[in-house]
Amino acid sequence: MAMLTTSDLLRRVPIFAGLTQAQISQLSGNVTKRRFKRGELIVEQGQKSGALFLILSGRARVSLTDKRAKEVILNTLGPGDCVGEMSLIDGQSHSASVRTDVQTDVLVLSHEEFVRCLAENHSIALWIMKDLVQRLRKSSDMVSSLALMDVYGRVAKVLIDAAQPHGESDAVVCEKMTRQDIAKMVGASREMVSRVMRDFEEQGFIKTNDNGSFVLQEHRLVLR
């Protein structure tokens, strides 16, 4: 199998979907490829990186950590997602950390090249605007669930949001999600999440597979 060129990789990133071949070729000479091992930080909360990171493969989590090292997981990122654009736009430090869950390959675009791309390609600016709006909506949704739902409802929402269609009534959570990770997403203790998951299993709402993924009876797992 032929090795993919930088131009081939750029075409796979949604933010560059509106670029011409000539623009892709120009951009390909100004990005670098980098590999992060599992558990490495791509960007760190409170710091500046001065670059845009475009995820090609792998998975990373967006999280906030307080002075007591308590972590809250805000989002999970995968292929096609961008990291660091907010800091590049407003010049401030990163509002959250992004750490890899598995080995993750990224393309790195410098601040200068990012600004040039924004100025010359309106499609990139529009894509970023849409992406930021989606993140804002997701943040509002998260605040709403924390304020208005009990722990059972918040855990159910995390599972449903992460699920992929499978059959007519079931949905499968493709990636392994530990009780600790779910606890960090819903603002509860690991013990409480374990109790909720056990109740869901006893009531037939979910089934845990040997590999750690879940099968959901989504029509029965009603948000509370």
Tell what function each PLM region has.
Residues 23, 74-137:
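Cyclic-nucleotide recognition modules
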